[in-house]
């Protein structure tokens, strides 16, 4: 009868050697993949440089770069050999490939003295220093905070939130103040609907507390165009997006945001009514401490086609 020890399976020494060999092979594959992505980034940077020299704004150039779609539409002055190559290879990119590609692309663009900024993707628009809001204790407090950033603010009151939104949408006012969040941080669905229908942006937000209450409301400064706050020290900055649920895998987008240094501040689902039937959206607010969102914007305009930036803003403390 065999001893118990003879029935045991004792892994041979070759097992550890196999593991090392597999790890080395995996590392080699990763290096090869990075080389492939670097080649793609070089081709893409050439493509974008040509578009830039033809006078195309970065926001349009990155949209044309589209690695997910056919190369049927191409700018006349672009390097026509580059785009089909990128389009063909882009269909095989994994979620991680996409983030690495954008990082490499940013490096290649910098070598060509092309350094996109947030304002290239979300062009700021000059607005009248005319404010409007529905007068109440909280709105008065919010106005005192927001007005500090302007040279000659003027004000008129609106009878309703809808009237305030219409004043901005129609150009009678440059900014309106709206209650964005209830006490406890709950977003007001009616405000999200107004912003969606009128295609307005968030320029800034601030908490307001009324008569010394511990939990306050959050008011937003709303405008027709983007207002890009400067990156200052370690201050928090926020990027807010709205995208249809079918636009892209949410986990992939959030992983990319984290890769580029942005953390999730808030996510909620919205049911918004437009000109046609209601659609389901994600409302996503991302936070970055003392840094910009340039790489993430490059990613979004390259790989996420159906989304709406609502604004880059700071949270002003009253």
Give the residues covered by each predicted segment.
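Domain-level signature for soluble enzymes in the chorismate/prephenate branch of the shikimate pathway
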Residues: 1-318
């Amino acid at each position: 009868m065999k001893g118990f020890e003879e029935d045991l399976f004792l892994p041979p020494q070759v097992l550890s050697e196999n593991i090392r060999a597999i790890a080395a092979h995996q590392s080699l594959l990763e290096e090869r993949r990075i080389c492939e992505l670097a080649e793609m980034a070089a081709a893409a940077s050439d493509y974008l440089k040509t578009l830039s020299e033809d006078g195309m704004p970065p926001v349009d150039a990155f949209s044309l770069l589209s690695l997910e779609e056919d190369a049927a539409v191409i700018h006349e002055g672009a390097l026509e050999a580059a785009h089909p190559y990128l389009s063909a290879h882009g269909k095989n990119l994994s979620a991680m490939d996409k983030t690495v590609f954008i990082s490499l692309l940013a490096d290649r663009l910098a070598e060509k003295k092309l350094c996109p900024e947030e304002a290239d993707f979300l062009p700021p628009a000059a607005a009248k220093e005319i404010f409007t809001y529905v007068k109440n204790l909280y709105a008065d407090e919010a106005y005192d905070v927001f007005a500090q950033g302007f040279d000659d603010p003027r004000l008129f009151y609106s009878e309703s939130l809808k009237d305030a939104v219409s004043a901005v949408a129609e150009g009678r006012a440059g900014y309106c103040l709206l209650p964005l969040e209830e006490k406890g941080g709950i977003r007001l669905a009616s405000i999200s609907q107004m912003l969606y229908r009128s295609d307005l942006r968030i320029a800034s937000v601030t908490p307001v507390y009324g008569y010394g209450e511990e939990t306050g409301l959050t008011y937003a400064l709303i405008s027709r165009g983007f207002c890009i706050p400067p990156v200052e020290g370690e201050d928090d900055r926020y990027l807010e997006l709205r995208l249809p649920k079918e636009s892209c895998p949410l986990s992939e987008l959030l992983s990319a945001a984290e890769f580029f240094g942005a953390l999730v501040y808030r996510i909620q689902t919205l049911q918004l009514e437009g000109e046609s039937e209601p659609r389901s959206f994600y409302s996503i607010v991302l936070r970055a401490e003392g840094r910009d969102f340039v790489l993430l914007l490059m990613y979004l305009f390259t790989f996420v086609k159906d989304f709406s930036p609502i604004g880059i803003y700071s949270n002003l403390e009253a």
